[in-house]
Amino acid sequence: MEKINHFIELTRIKRPIGYMLLFWPCVWGLTIAYDFSNNIQIFLKYGVLFLCGSILMRSAGCIINDIVDKDFDAKVSRTKTRPIASGKISVKHGLLYSVFLCLIAFLVLIQFNMFTIILAMCSMPLAFSYPYMKRFTYWPQLFLG
């Protein structure tokens, strides 16, 4: 059970601000684009898909960030207890978990149209470059969009 808690901690699911920052722009876009004379269940379906995708991709991104920053995190009091930095979870297991979350997120993504799928796939290099951008700029969040 302790190992499961470390994997939950790795995703930062208990800190919702990260996935909400992904989710709200999606819902705003959906609300602006949606024709509410259609069935509201379709709107709700896409809202739930956006929420699931936001949680999954933010979680995968946190894991990649922890893998890239593990040596730095181990030296900083605020981050030294993170599961990868502290050695509670190996880099290999963290990477496998991140890939697993990305695969589930892809299953969510393919529920959308082809334009959305292509746009999302094109944004992936930007999202996963974030941990590296912290080494070159004071504004790495610009690469997240």
Model-identified regions with their sequence ranges:
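Intramembrane alpha-helical segments
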Residues: 8-9, 82-145
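Cytosolic, membrane-interface loops and tails of multi-pass inner-membrane proteins
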Residues: 1-7, 62-89
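Membrane-embedded alpha-helical segments that form the functional core of polytopic membrane enzymes
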Residues: 27, 31-68, 78, 102-106, ...
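The first (N-terminal) embedded transmembrane alpha-helix
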Residues: 13-32, 145
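N-terminal membrane topogenic signal
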Residues: 3-18, 92-94
